[in-house]
Amino acid sequence: MTKKVWISRSQPGAAALADKLAASKISVLQKPVLTISPINCPYPRELPKLVICLSGHAARIYRESSASLSNKTIKHIAIGRETASILRSSFTNTIFPFDERSEGVIGLREIQEISVGEIVWLLTGRQGRGVIESVLENRGCKLYRLALYEQVRKEVKGIDPEKISCVVVGSVVGMQYVEEFLKGFKGTLSVPIIVPSLRIKKEAENLGFTEVYNVGSANVSDVSIFVEDFLVGR
């Protein structure tokens, strides 16, 4: 029986990952447990000294907003390569950390040099990360946390856990929905879980999953390579 990789992360990342794995002759089941719903979030009138973007979803929504037009020359920080590539189509002064996670952003010189009272926009989702937000608040800047979207649960059907080789998860919220689905289906949490960060790995283990692997990146290419290597070693 050929088992499939269940890609539970949201679009468009799910489709991009599915294409890469399919190109390597890996069977996939593209069943996102979340959809992304934009939020009508008002942008500040005050122009920022720095814009920090924590996801590709936030980058796409922000890039299409009229508020972004005044920020063309302002420095932008992206959480990783994929988010940076979205921003750079409109904002050439965009950087990202070598360590593509919250800790990497925090370690950047641009974050360390933020002064008291400087205006910073933090672009994220409603269920976004709090680590960077806490660091910025402690630095005394004038922080605007802009929740541009929310992750909405999507019902999934037609999945037999016994026919799944592993599950690729993209967020804590997605991890929780995968856990609820699997518990409702024979109660098994033994299926291997592949996650992008240590934070989500810990969440998966706290939920009871017994085999969790951390890619250390949410980048589609990195995840694809990791999944391929994982399956070769099974």
Describe these PLM feature segments.
Residues M1-R234:
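Signature of uroporphyrinogen-III synthase
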